[in-house]
Amino acid sequence: VTNKPNVFTSLATRLAPRRRFLKAAGSAAAAALTAPAVLTGRAAGPILIGAGEHTYEVTHDWARLPEGRAFGYTHGVIVDGQGRVFIHNQSEDAVSIFDPEGRFVRSWGPEFKGGAHGMQYSREGGDEFLYLSDIGRKQVIKTTLDGEIVWTIGCPMASGVYDDPGKFVPTNTAVAPNGDVYVADGYGQSWVHQFNARAEYIRTWGGKGSEAGRLDCPHGIWIDTRSDAPRVVVADRSNRRLQYFSLDGRHEGFVTDDLRHPCHFDQRGEELLIPDLHGRVTILDRDNRLIVHLGDYEGVEKLKGYPNLPREERPAGRFISPHDACWDAAGNIYVVEWIRDGRVTKLRRAG
């Protein structure tokens, strides 16, 4: 951790039980999920994936754009307080908005064309905001839901870890309960930067590597509130793991099982949702044990042309390259994929 010194007490004692549950997923849970992931009652019927309470009906290409418009790569997705679905995509307008039935509402953000990556939703008091990670402009932009800019963060040169501001390429953000903002430099130098709610720099940690506390493409970041104290969890993608930190950047543990190329997160109650770039979406329980893999397309990343497979080569009920995913209030899941023409899939809860 660079910059401000921090007090961190009795870490080993306080976190011993948590390290145990972070170490590995339960083998019994994993074994129970070896049954086929795609269930079809009849050829013309609905496509169901998952198991038990986590069974979902699949609708690919759920979001319907006006004629003549296209998404480009679909990189981020959130659901707002009205149940509207916001897609962060690399088209003319960076943000496209849909009602709960998949009907197009409006779009905005031509000034962010081509740079759309992560998108984080935050309710702050009575207001709602978006945090957009722009890999083209190498900025994080806080906006209202209508696209009004609140503030912008560029390369944090105060961190002392950059000799060139162009090496900062933010991929995702997380917002803590106190309003602090955590920025993952996933496509840059693999740092995590912490700012306060006014976008003022606080500290930095991480940096490229595989040892504890180091990261290699920290692609996604989240504030995990499922335990007694909120913690930062990072999708340490190229290291194929999740890595946990305290809110002031102290390493706390890993999750290494049941992951291929984790991209980002969403949380609903005691469950954690993880879109995995290599062909599936994963749900973990409170102890980070596997509940289910959804739409698993094992080996898809080895196919010629991945991820831009022609539509006729995209099996129904299988994912190609999930880049982000989120729940709505009813427990339905929306998945966006890293595909040149974009793909938005709705998983309607059926279990």
Summary of predicted features, one role per range:
Residues 321-351:
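Blade-level signature of beta-propeller repeat domains, shared across WD40, Kelch, NHL, RCC1
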Residues 98-127, 135:
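Blade-loop segments of beta-propeller domains
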